[in-house]
Amino acid sequence: MTLSPPARLARILALAVPALLLGGAYLSQYGFGLYPCEMCWWQRWPHFAAVGLALLAYVTPPARSWTALAALAIVTSGAIGLFHAGVEYGWWPGITSCALVAGNGSGNALEDIMNTPLVRCDQPAWTLFGISLAGYNFLVSSAAGLVIGRLLMKDRRA
């Protein structure tokens, strides 16, 4: 079955967006020394899944379903990015040990400090216009996932 132009564009975006975001993440990591924290890794996993799902859309029917699942994975990464950005901006506490929490319960402040990972989730490694990488992941991933979903719905109505 041949896909309509909107569905083809959705499939292209479902592959290109997470691949480019992962490429940017690895470029910033290995090219510029911005090493990922635990929550940064959480944001990458849905993008890996989205790339795999989008590739399936090219080789295995039903392409629309695989593309929709890829869009869902992309939006999931965006949601994790929103949570991570909120931790970085102090809107809410982090749920992992990579955010520095006053008094981790050991009763030994030095031990708490020594057990805190070197790359902390509650401190943005880099910002542009006051937005962290997690914030940009939220913006790009959420917008891309919604655009892909819209293209797929447009295709269904045609």
Regions found by a protein language model. Give the residues of each.
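Transmembrane alpha-helical insertion/packing segments
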Residues: 1-46
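Interfacial segments of alpha-helical transmembrane regions
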Residues: 5-16, 59-78, 145-147
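Membrane-interface loop-to-helix entry segments
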Residues: 39-49, 128-143
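Structural signal for the C-terminal ends of transmembrane alpha-helices
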Residues: 55-62, 149-156
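Extracytosolic (periplasmic/ER-lumenal) interhelical loops and adjacent juxtamembrane/interface segments
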Residues: 89-134
